[in-house]
Amino acid sequence: MDKYSFLNAASTAYFGDLYDKYLENPDAIEPSWRAFFQGFDFAQEQYGAPLQEAVPVMVQQVVSNEANKPSEKIEKEFKVLNLINAYRTYGHLLTQINPLAAREPQLIDLSIERYGLSTADLDVVFDSAKEIGLSPTSLRQIVSTLQQLFCRSVGVEYQYIREASVRQWIDQHLQKNNNTTPFSKEDKIRLLRKLNEATSFENFLHTKYVGQKRFSLEGNDALVAGLDFMVEAAAEKGVTHLVLGMAHRGRLNVLANVFGKNPQDIFSEFDGKDYEMDDWFDGDVKYHLGITAERTSRSGKKIDMNLVPNPSHLETVAAVVEGITRAKQDRYCKDNPLKALPIVIHGDAAVCGQGIVYETVQMCGLRGFKTGGTIHIVVNNQVGFTTNYTDSRSSIYATDIAKVNDSPVLHVNADDAEAVVHAFLFALDFRQAFGKDVFIDLIGYRKYGHNEGDEPRFSQPKMYKLIGKHDNPRNIYAQKLITEGLIQQSLVTEMENEYKALLDAHLETSRKEPLTVIKPFMQTEWQGFKIASPAEMLQSVDTTINKETLTKIAEVLTELPADKNFISKVKKVVADRKEASFQNNHIDWGMAELLAYGSLLTEGYEVRLTGEDVQRGTFSHRHAVLKTEDTEEEICFLQDLKHKKSMAKGDFHIYNSLLSEYGVLGYEYGYALASPYTLTIWEAQFGDFSNGAQIMLDQYISCGEDKWKVQDGLVMLLPHGYEGQGAEHSSARVERYLQLCAENNMYVANCTTPANFFHLLRRQMKTTFRKPLVVFTPKSLLRHPQVISSLEDLAEGQFREVIADPIADANKVKRVVFCSGRFYYDLYAEREKLGRDDIALVRIEQLFPLPVEQLKEVVAKYVNATDFVWAQEEPKNMGAYGYMLMNFDLVKWRYVGTPAYAAPASGSHTRDRKRHNEVIAKVFE
């Protein structure tokens, strides 16, 4: 049977429709048809006829004589196309990207025979060459070009990208100079100079500070050159702000040779000198510190550069980098976000093993978190501490996370310096063209162990035998230039001697200085702010606001647009707010919160609120964004204050986040770090879930100022309260936050009135310094009939760290009960029921810093009190009890609460309420 007989039934109209779809979007049709039409384009050119005419002609020629030359030619054109597509898809598996050894054999065959061609076809000219940017040429030349494009020192993965235009751009970009960058003699010498700086810097430290940890870059020295060329090119492309995050590996080298940190300061850190700062600053190890620098390109363009400080917890800084970048885009680059460039440098083991990488990568296309694309660079040592890569990932490459969001990957041999720079420039071009993420897999090695005092041959003796014989990238590149006749060895020696002399001079100067100087990070953004003293943190702050202004804001917040349709429940929410505010003068929690934001917006501050479900609020109390019934158009009254009512100067941003605590909290920490005039808030869905971000709390939020001399005003709203919902929906782990409190590092509050919450939020922006603020927010109090404030309370009041009991006769009080948060209302209800006027209930609204002087005044009021109690609903080993035990010694007091439990709460509602009521009863015994 004729194997082409099926073509007799071909419908010209069907071909035409399918071809139209192919032209519109090649990815929309079945892959085999896509391959057919790629070849058909060539055939159409050959016949010089429209598709409707060409199809019957081709079908007739194929059917009438299988052996005739035109049909053979067409069939082989298809085979060449298949070969080209195979190289595009699998060529990276055959690249020469390992500087230590040839790659292990891959289960891929890109021979011409595999695709139905033979050596007899090598000199046949094929039109398919146009697919790789060539004129019609021989198969021999096509194969040679394919090997240059896809199988040399740079391997590219991109065929999984769904957008055809992106793949086509990559194809065209690769075809320029056969996937290389042409370098002038000047560029090559500049490249050699940067390699020399990278190598000589490490050699200098290795000899001057023997055995000290520095986490050498050696084996991936070309990172410095790649970054240097990328920064220069970025400035030329209009980038004005660059934010870089990286771990310890090679950090000192990047600080010195990319960011221009004075080696003198690095040497001071190696010498272990004390800091010039006072006791409120403890500092950090040298390979964690950040820097802000301004670099001027060779053509005079300036670029603000920031290397973000970070802890040893790998990959955490990635989310922080994204947040800082977004803040800079919102402030400086509203016209073009691509002017701010985030770069994240990963380790090969960490990028595979740390889940925050996935959380951060998922942000790249989300409207509340996207930053116009991030350049990810994996410094691939082929080993993680002592663990071989075969034990640290299941994927072929360390960069396979890139496929989650259709990011291209460039795998590059770190010994090929020109290929490295080419890959870095390629990545920059891609990011600026599409505003999407791109990954570079910089495959090198680690010359020493994990640190310079570690013995790597315990675990990788074979690899380190190879490394011991391997020359460094500088010498390899220098020899290449010598072979090309561009330089002589004397130039290399001169470079090395000059740079060493420079470092020697800095070392001599450094050793004359008694102290280490830590320069401020992002000083431009933080001009006018100061480090707060303990007394300043407890000073009252004026948070009043004109009542008329508040009234106008309330009017905007309670008026639905008449020309929009909303579901009845939305109408009721807004109507109830209007009635409560203007008829009853009852401001509930949700309304007070929105008024706080609105008031700050009118004063020129910005507000950013993110977290899971924050637009509506987990407990349906906020409704900051309303949706129309028919189109789901978003209506945000707080944005209308600026854009429709011209009442506000600042912008209001509120975004439902991806379902992430760790990554999103890190992002918001970064945002607040770069935007001190923005009230930056992260709300947990339930406070219980905030411990999913524990690393961010422990390593950044609680101690960033103490370690890195950076302030951060991030607000965390953590719903907390025991209401019978079980162990996972009751406790924000108050005890853990209080355990982190020391040296004036943050505020911790547990408010009980809408007005106090209102003033607390305003205070966060009104101080001349910034501290993180942790607020344990209520759940049941959101609609509690007693939890209301008046408009006057908001306009005229201030934040009250302690709320004394307004009991009529303080002289009658025999027992003073201190408590915090929603538990107060349970105690209050019981006291009212019992008619006990001998017991005063004192609310501590700010737990840290503890307002000791105010507490003294409160205690002094109750001159006849002999019994002092700390009461809490949390178990004894949780809540604020342990903290109060350490810090509250004004009077001798006793604990009333449940005993210690392993879980925060019982899963049985009956048991939970029984325990709860027993505590209340004990308070009034």
Model-derived segments and spans:
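Active-site pocket-lining segments that scaffold enzyme catalytic pockets across diverse folds
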Residues: 200, 204-264, 579, 587-601, ...
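Cofactor-binding active-site loop characterized by glycine-rich and histidine/acidic residues
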Residues: 240-406, 410, 619-676
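Alpha-helix capping and helix-loop boundary segments enriched in small/acidic/polar residues
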Residues: 6-9, 71, 214-221, 304-315, ...
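Flexible, glycine-rich loop/tail regions that form catalytic "lids" or insertion modules at the edges
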Residues: 75-85, 92-127, 144, 199, ...
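Extended, charge-enriched "interface" segments that sit outside catalytic cores
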Residues: 40-222, 239
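Subset of Sec-pathway N-terminal targeting signals
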Residues: 1-40, 44
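Active-site cores of enzymes that catalyze phosphoryl transfer or operate on phosphate-rich substrates
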Residues: 179-201, 272-322, 326-333, 637, ...
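Conserved phosphate-handling catalytic cores of large alpha/beta enzymes
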Residues: 384-395, 403-439, 443-449, 457
